[in-house]
């Protein structure tokens, strides 16, 4: 940026501030504009090459910009406080939710570049930024970060959408109903839910957790599952997808990593592994919900679920690269048969361990733990079954020593398996190399 842009920003902010001090207009609109202009002026003030020095001489606009920044910050705080006082508790909670969603985005896109710029100005040390060149500016870094955050947001929100569908699957499958060919409607008043009211996470917040037609409360379970699956997709995006599957044993090193080189210039074998593991954990969520509801899982669904992971992993070796035990590798010389034998062996080990754990834990429903552990064996390998089982038992001990959790989670072994898998997965390669038999 240059002095002309600084002057333009100053004039625009003064005009905006003068118009916002009145009580006319929508309060939300005033708050959004004030906060946006505050960040804009802050980005100008923090850039030493623009505000403090212009063409080698002190910039006369420096002090007015700082005063304007303070004024905008104070005005923003007053407007937000007034908005919270005018609205009821539900509106305040809604604002809190939107803030929780927006703060990470603003911190990553705006906060980090501004902090880096301030650090460079105060310390004189250049901050290393990927792709930084001679013409690199704070605005370009914000745009670059916004593009990366958008890609991350798309993958994460895809998880929320799948989580919304999994709520339906967990309800319909034990009852033998179709999960795909049905319209969403309120279970109380039977009103059909519009598309705008059926957006995962956002609609729940916007409706204040109530049906638009009859105002009956929407169970928090829907939001929790959507956020959980979104967290699965988002976390695997960060530590598995953009790292080139660095957490997976027996994976070769990927030359170029990051969102640009993995997603935008797609490396399909890494992307396929990512979705394979995302859907594996998603189905563990389904099995956990069925277990929570004390429903019986049909045998044909369990078999179909196991085959839906066994067949792709047999055809595409990269989906499960963990080597087979030596005695299985020596049985056959055909790669496909050896791969199938490895996966089937791991699935059987998982089912057997589930039977042993079931005898110890004595859950009310064994129909979900066995297919869940079989899936874990197929996807993670038989060695990881031992590691995950140890984590499960440790989590079980923690649960039984916490009074508030003792009555519910202590008899939910499939959910404990899901938690153990989520803890184990980022450290899969490290644990495999250190503790494998």
Regions found by a protein language model. Give the residues of each.
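A membrane-topology feature that recognizes alpha-helical transmembrane segments
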Residues: 1-437
């Amino acid at each position: 940026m240059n002095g002309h842009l600084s002057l333009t920003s100053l004039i625009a902010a003064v005009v905006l501030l003068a118009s916002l001090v009145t009580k006319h207009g929508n309060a939300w609109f005033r708050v959004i504009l004030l906060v946006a202009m505050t960040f804009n002026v802050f980005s100008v003030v923090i850039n030493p090459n623009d505000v403090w020095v212009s063409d080698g001489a002190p910039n006369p606009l420096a002090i007015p910009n700082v005063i304007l920044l303070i004024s905008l910050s104070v005005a923003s705080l007053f407007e937000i406080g007034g908005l919270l006082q005018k609205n009821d508790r539900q509106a305040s909670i809604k604002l809190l939710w939107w803030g929780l969603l927006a703060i990470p985005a603003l911190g990553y896109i705006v906060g980090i570049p501004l902090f880096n710029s301030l650090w460079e100005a105060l310390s004189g040390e250049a901050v290393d930024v990927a792709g930084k060149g001679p013409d690199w500016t704070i605005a370009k870094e914000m745009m670059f970060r916004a593009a990366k955050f958008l890609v991350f947001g798309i993958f994460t929100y895809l998880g929320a959408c799948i989580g919304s569908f999994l709520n339906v699957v967990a309800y319909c499958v034990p009852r033998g109903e179709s999960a795909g060919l049905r319209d969403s409607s309120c279970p109380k008043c039977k009103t059909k839910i519009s598309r705008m009211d059926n957006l995962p996470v956002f609609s729940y917040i916007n409706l204040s957790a109530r049906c638009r037609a009859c105002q009956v409360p929407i169970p928090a379970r829907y939001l929790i599952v959507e956020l959980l699956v979104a967290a699965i997709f988002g976390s695997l995006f960060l530590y598995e997808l953009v790292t080139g599957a660095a957490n997976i044993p027996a994976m070769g090193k990927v030359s170029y990593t990051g969102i640009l080189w993995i997603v935008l210039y797609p490396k399909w074998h890494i992307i396929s592994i990512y979705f394979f593991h995302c859907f594996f954990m998603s189905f563990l969520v389904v099995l956990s919900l069925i277990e929570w509801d004390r429903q019986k899982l049909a045998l044909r669904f369990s078999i179909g679920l196991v085959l839906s992971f066994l067949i792709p992993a047999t055809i595409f070796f990269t989906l499960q690269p963990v080597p087979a035990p030596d005695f299985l590798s020596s049985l056959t010389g055909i790669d496909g048969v050896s791969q199938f034998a490895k996966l089937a062996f791991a699935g059987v080990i998982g089912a057997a361990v589930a039977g042993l754990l079931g005898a110890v834990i004595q859950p009310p429903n064994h129909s979900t733990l066995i297919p869940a552990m079989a899936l874990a064996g197929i996807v993670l390998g038989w060695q990881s079954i031992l590691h995950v089982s140890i984590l499960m038992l440790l989590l079980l001990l923690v649960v039984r020593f916490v009074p508030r959790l003792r009555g519910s989670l202590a008899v939910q072994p499939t959910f404990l398996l899901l938690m153990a898998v989520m803890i184990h997965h980022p450290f899969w390669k490290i644990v495999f190399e250190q503790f494998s038999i």
